Amino acid sequence: MNDLSQKKLIIYIGLGIVLFGAGTLVTYFFLFRGIGAPAEPKEPEPVSENIPGFPEAGPGIGKDPRFGGGNIQPGSDREIPIAAGIRTRLFLVAELASLGTGLSRAEDKIYYFKKDGGELDAFSFPAGTKEPLSTITIVSMVNAFWSPTRDRAIVSYLDGVVTKSFLFKGIGTSSVATLPVGIRSSAWSPTGSSLVYLTEKDGETALATADSSGKNQKTIFRTPIRELALSWPLSEKFALQTNPSGVVPGYIFIFTRASGELTRFLGPTNGLTSLWSPKGEKLLTGSTNAAGKSLSLAIHDSSGKEIFSPDLQTLPEKCSWAREEKVYCAVPRGIPQDAILPDDYRRGELNTNDRLVAIDLKTKIVSGVFNDGGYDMADIVVTKDEKFIFFTDRITGKVWGLEVTQ
């Protein structure tokens, strides 16, 4: 072999050794170095003490960074002890985000629509079994309001930016009836035999009624007042409430069908929100000061006179009447100092961490019922015997049930 060939051979061998060493080093770093090495420490995910796997919420955990922590409004962290002898069992009803909950006639099932797709399901209790009731598809569903007869519901959904509604007419079927486009608010009559709704057009708000099948629609009143919400507490009386804001005075008006008169019932009151009792004999209201803070509750009789003011800071929409003398409310453990109510809550910028309490109007006693987990409770539903309470968590959209014994 000549000298040139020997030099080439030496060079090739040297390059091979270098490449082999580099490959070995790369393999070591990428494949073997991590084996046996301690993992980087991770911050443990907080969970509820009594409900494993569910994150504990703070006083304000909404989208707005103002509510990540800090000071809370005076009096909003009041302790509410659990009543003596009360025992509760929490169970999951719907794992997927849902809305439009309602009880069956026999009060042995809770109905709910899946938010993604709008299918109607039922959860039987206490058995804990589930069954699909309708496969109708509802895209961009907003809400559903069940009739007092518990066999049909007014369903609203978004078509682009336009709100559309229809009447879901039968459990276990896909029978529907179209309602007018642009319904702003709707309600059932106390017996469920009729429905009423509000639409806005040409600078006016129109109040119209229809039968329980959505037929025989008739406009019965018009007003220049805009952005109203509707309730039907008594057969001949309709309650019209102005859009609530903590920084703007609000009103509740009563329209009497027989006389055609519109009269002021409550207001001007900042942060005014409301919830009528089942028979329309009482009204639960929430209000604030002129800055949208210092939230308070009050209960009025049918004339508007205040009859009781429990020392609680919550919104009526987080409450449910079990009967004329009993109200259940979800009460935040604290309200952030910078929160304006009900504005921030209704815009979805604020979530609350709630306890569940009962308000007895006969004894004027407020007692704790449930004080676990990190739930922003809404759409509370209570059985007549008060042994089962259901709520939707606004944070996750899941539906939960609570069995109460004492």
Where are these regions (language model features)?
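Sequence/structural signature of beta-propeller modules
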Residues: 1-90, 406
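Beta-strand-rich domains and repeat architectures in extracellular enzymes and scaffolds
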Residues: 58-121, 138-144, 377
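Conserved beta-propeller blade repeats
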Residues: 95-104, 137-154, 175-198, 217-241, ...
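Short, solvent-exposed loop/turn segments at conserved positions within beta-propeller repeat blades
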Residues: 113-116, 158-163, 200-204, 244-249, ...
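Short coil turn/linker residues within repeat-based beta-strand modules
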Residues: 117, 126-129, 170-174, 213-216, ...
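Beta-propeller blade signature
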Residues: 167-171, 210-212, 253-258, 297-302, ...
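Short, conserved, GDST-rich strand-edge loop motifs in beta-rich repeat architectures
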Residues: 330-351, 401
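Blade-level signature of beta-propeller repeat domains, shared across WD40, Kelch, NHL, RCC1
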Residues: 380-406
